[in-house]
Amino acid sequence: MQANSRAFFLLIAVIAFGLVGYALYLQHVEGLQPCPLCVLQRFAFVGIGVFSLLAALSSATRLLWHGLGMLSGLGGIFVAGYHVSLLLNPKASCGIDPIENWVNALPTAKWLPQVFESDGLCTAPLPPVLGVSIPLWSLIWMVILALTLVVAMIRRERR
């Protein structure tokens, strides 16, 4: 598949939306409540998905959407990395999280609370998936998607 092609961006969007779908499965079927950092990671995956979908649909503004998708991924890497660091050092987390108040005050938490409302604790122990913590999986996928978009941008610029 050619980087920067319509199919490339559609694949990135499907993966990103699929990961959000899996997060919703974990929340609504398995009963795992998302913490504020989980919700921010959902925003990043949704951003990657939406901007990749827009890049697939519009060749005239593809570069803009591609860049915004990369920025969403890089922001997601930062949030997921911070989340993993909290799990490695749970004493760094305090009981009341000001990020939760901010996330739950966003309009999206009111419009789609089943997707964007935060009720969990960032350091709560979660069952691993295939032996890996859920925040680490999020970081891994965020790196894969962001790096794929960055490499595609570099290849595009070399042409």
Swiss-Prot record:
Residue ranges annotated as Cytoplasmic topological domain: 1-8, 58-63, 156-159
Transmembrane segments: 9-25, 44-57, 64-81, 137-155
GO molecular function: electron transfer activity; protein-disulfide reductase activity
Positions of disulphide bridges: C35-C38, C94-C122
Residue numbers on the Periplasmic membrane side: 26-43, 82-136
Pfam family, one: DsbB
Keyword Cell inner membrane among UniProt keywords: yes
Function per UniProt: Required for disulfide bond formation in some periplasmic proteins. Acts by oxidizing the DsbA protein.
Family as reported in the entry's similarity comment: Belongs to the DsbB family.
Name of the molecule in the record: Disulfide bond formation protein B
Source organism of this protein record: Ralstonia nicotianae (strain ATCC BAA-1114 / GMI1000) (Ralstonia solanacearum)
Biological classification of the source: Bacteria, Pseudomonadati, Pseudomonadota, Betaproteobacteria, Burkholderiales
Gene: dsbB
